[in-house]
Amino acid sequence: MTKQQIQGDRAEEIAFQLLQRKGWVLLDRNWSCRWGELDLVLQKDQRLLVVEVKGRTAQRHDRGGLDAFHSHKRRRLARAINCWRSHHPDAGHQLLQVVLALVNLSGSATRVRWLAIHQLS
């Protein structure tokens, strides 16, 4: 595994653990189709949560991962969500929320910034 893959896995695990403590149940992790990948898909009550995770260290200068979530990435994410829902028709009626988790991996105190995504395309 590359250093970036290790950082990405660590950031996803941190985001997942925080959400799990709040009662979210993991449905899929790193689910992929030809349109893209979904980092985390979780469920709580009758709600679905799709989380795009960006893990960064202090050396990166892309606003903590926010710059990496550009319009092309948002379109790919929207297509991947539609693909996931077509493979999980029982989840089609549930309210869907998409969030971006910006995980700061520098230092001993990990910080996560959560941003709700209201429009993907």
Swiss-Prot record:
SUPFAM superfamilies: Restriction endonuclease-like. It holds the Pfam family UPF0102. GO terms for molecular function: nucleic acid binding. Signal peptide: none annotated. Gene3D superfamilies: 3.40.1350.10. InterPro entries: Restrct_endonuc-II-like, tRNA_endonuc-like_dom_sf, UPF0102_YraN-like. Belongs to the UPF0102 family. PANTHER family: UPF0102 PROTEIN YRAN (PTHR34039:SF1). This is UPF0102 protein Syncc9902_1284. The lineage of its organism: Bacteria, Bacillati, Cyanobacteriota, Cyanophyceae, Synechococcales.
